[in-house]
Amino acid sequence: MRLMRRLLLFVAAALVFSGCVGSRVVERGEYVDEVVIHEVVSARYEIASSLPVDYADDMEWILRYDSSDVEELRQRAATEDKECDVLFFGSSSIRLWRTLEEDMAPLKVVNRGYGGAMLRDIHYYYETVLADYRPRAFVFYCDNDLGGFGRDLHPTELFDLYRLLVERLKADYPEYPIYFLAIKFNDSRLAKREEHRLFNAIMADYAAHTEGVSFVDVNSPLLNEDGSVNNAYFESDMLHVNREGYAVWSSILRPMLLEELGLDAK
């Protein structure tokens, strides 16, 4: 059994907790069950989450963007206004949304995406990504855990991480909705197509049965009638959507958010 299937989530209501969750240092190559990566304590819940890894040096991989993209997020958080309507976060498909503010107007949005992010990283950097922002809704996109890399997860393993993210957000922002964007099919990762399809189906079903969680199909409008990818919506890398692709996403997502937050479209 792969270790990621042993993802741990402990939720206890109205507990007062002090102290640290510890992890032992292991030598290179030593097999371990999990390394505790984060602890969140809120007024309503205590959540201690563990990220299973194969070896201790996996932490070097988790921290691979700490001095670059993640550091940029830290610096921006020090100066940006924390009040916003919607916080967008996730991987490069969020970060590269250069026209996000324009596309979502009159919604006040903040972009907390960073390139190469996996959901495993985002769990580690949860407090860094969200910082002290005070949004009224969340939008999340991340597909790199199913990106065709050596560290890929199975769709059901990734689903466990999504459920963990929901629990953490609901603990800290109990009244605010969460919108998960479907993984977009793309020709750059054609070999992962069926895994993307399976994961989207899992998340759509989960959202349909989970209060405060929405699954937004931003994938289907980017496809041709025969189900192939319409590359007119993609950059030359065949991975990231271009301006036209983001316009499609905006046309779907913006009305949902405006209605959710009770704002006029004008």
How does the language model describe each region?
Residues 126, 162-167, 200, 204:
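Generic structural signal for well-ordered alpha-helices
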Residues 1-10, 16-86, 102, 260-266:
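N-terminal secretory targeting modules
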Residues 185-266:
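Catalytic His-Asp segment of secreted/periplasmic serine-dependent ester chemistry enzymes
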Residues 155-163, 195-200:
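Charged helix-capping and loop-helix junction motifs
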Residues 83-99, 117:
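Catalytic nucleophile-elbow at a beta strand-turn-alpha helix junction centered on a G-D-S/GDSL motif
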Residues 94-110, 121-159, 179, 183-187:
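Oxyanion-hole/transition-state-stabilizing segment in secreted/luminal serine hydrolases
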Residues 173-177:
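A short helix->loop->beta-strand "cap" motif at the edges of active sites that frequently abuts
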Residues 75-86, 124-132, 167-170:
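Short amphipathic alpha-helices and their capping/turn segments at secondary-structure boundaries
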